[in-house]
């Protein structure tokens, strides 16, 4: 099996009973798909860590090389790609803690490193180049993102799309008005288009498998229906803009009239 197949299976089992969120306390909860992915990937990462520890003991080494991946959170970017002793993995990388190495949502792992035999996968020069590259920002819709910020934005968009898919399906199951169902489906397609454009602009691979964990099948409307909906939305937006402009003009005219009357009153008082 692969990670995505396992996540889809577990999410399907949990949501089949009607479960939609997982509460971690009175003030914090996550959607089922978010909680499942975090739990499974974190657990598999920790299992890999235990295997690396066993291999390190067998090889007689206390040093390990942490792997590197793009878009690492800032706290992890400082130590990824480097060689550390096991104690340093704990003290510097936070091994064994939630926010540290192999903690919540951490995608890093580490492998035994034998001094004098092993060759580093990531040189300091290469790491320095990547650090500068990852810090570069790209503008989208008036906001700038570095690599980490862009990946976080991707995750937010994926979560929002899963929620929209669920909304569309629940409206259908609840036999809501056809227009409401269509509107929900078209909004989902619009979000998908935005996700595609954002990913292309940021030069990040799309991870649509994260969107389809729900196993809900096709939610997007036909191309013809979507284009018709887009035209309707554009027309509504144009009408709203025109109404807003008319309101602004009216307010401006009313203010001008008040100013004119105030000037006339002031002139009469000085006669």
Where would I find each of the regions flagged by the language model?
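Domain-core detector
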Residues: 1-98, 116-271
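C-terminal edge-of-domain segments
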Residues: 95-114
């Amino acid at each position: 099996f692969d990670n995505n197949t396992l996540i889809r299976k577990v999410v399907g089992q949990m949501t089949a009973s009607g479960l939609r969120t997982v509460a971690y306390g009175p003030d914090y909860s996550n959607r089922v798909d978010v909680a499942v992915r975090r739990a499974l990937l974190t657990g598999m990462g920790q299992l890999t860590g235990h295997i690396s520890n066993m291999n390190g003991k067998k090889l007689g080494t206390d040093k390990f090389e942490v792997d590197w991946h793009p878009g690492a959170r800032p706290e992890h970017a400082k130590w990824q790609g480097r060689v550390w002793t096991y104690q340093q993995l704990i003290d510097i990388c936070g091994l064994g803690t939630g926010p540290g190495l192999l903690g919540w949502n951490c995608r890093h792992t580490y492998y035994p490193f034998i001094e004098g035999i092993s060759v580093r996968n990531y040189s300091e020069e290469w790491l320095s180049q990547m650090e500068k590259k990852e810090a570069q920002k790209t503008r989208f819709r008036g906001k700038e993102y570095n690599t980490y910020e862009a990946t976080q934005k991707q995750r937010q968009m994926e979560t929002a799309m899963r929620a929209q898919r669920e909304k569309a399906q629940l409206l259908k199951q609840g036999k809501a008005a056809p227009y409401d169902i269509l509107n929900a489906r078209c909004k989902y397609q619009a979000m998908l288009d935005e996700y595609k454009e954002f990913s292309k602009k940021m030069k990040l691979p799309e991870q649509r498998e994260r969107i389809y964990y729900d196993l809900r099948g096709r939610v997007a409307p036909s191309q013809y229906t979507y284009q018709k909906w887009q035209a309707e939305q554009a027309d509504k937006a144009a009408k709203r803009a025109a109404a807003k402009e008319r309101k602004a003009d009216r307010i401006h005219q009313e203010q001008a009239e008040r100013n004119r009357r105030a000037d006339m009153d002031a002139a009469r008082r000085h006669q």
